[in-house]
Amino acid sequence: MLKKDLLNLYEDAKSIHFSFIGLVKRNILISTLILIVYLSIFFVDPIVRDWFSKIHNNFFDFVFNIGHWYGKPYLTFTSFLLLYIGGILFSNNRIRESGWKIFEAFVLSGIIVTVIKSILGRWRPYTEHGNFAFYFLTFGPNDHLSLPSGDVAIAFAFSTVVAGFFDNKAWKIFWFSMAVLTALGRIYHDQHWLTDVILAAVISTCVGNVVNNNSRVNSELT
């Protein structure tokens, strides 16, 4: 059982790699335009940071602290363990696979985000180095591991997978709203630039969708 799940993790990792390369090759012009638009948002980063710095109050502190908690791995690991172990104990493959999808999305998006963080070494906004300051090829300290956001990656990976559990619009809106709250909170707490959270959200949403789709295909084949 665990061997099969680990094999699925490996296959999903390959699927993400080839899907990305294939998508870029088939849509070179669109991919280039998206990259240009994304890079242009870097010029907006200081404006967004300044705006968030002016809205601090007790209400927003409370709201964005919820997002701060949601972006930590506690909920992800708790959900994974409860569903995965519960599925095994009650011989329910659907529940077990649901837990494993949460774990997969967390691991795969985490690897991608960590690699990019270490390559780029972007300084966090609170360090006051500016939005175009990078310290390439680094493993730390945390002050220059800003792009992409790890917390936002965790939040969107979890939300994408969990939102796929049920085909219900309200259910999906709730979970993605929580992820967006995490993203906004990271800017509010001056931990990340807007471009940091955008890239993390895109990466984890794509990873989560690949995990969901591959799981659905595997279920149909079995």
State each model region's role.
Residues 103-124, 185-200, 204:
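Hydrophobic alpha-helical transmembrane segments of integral membrane proteins
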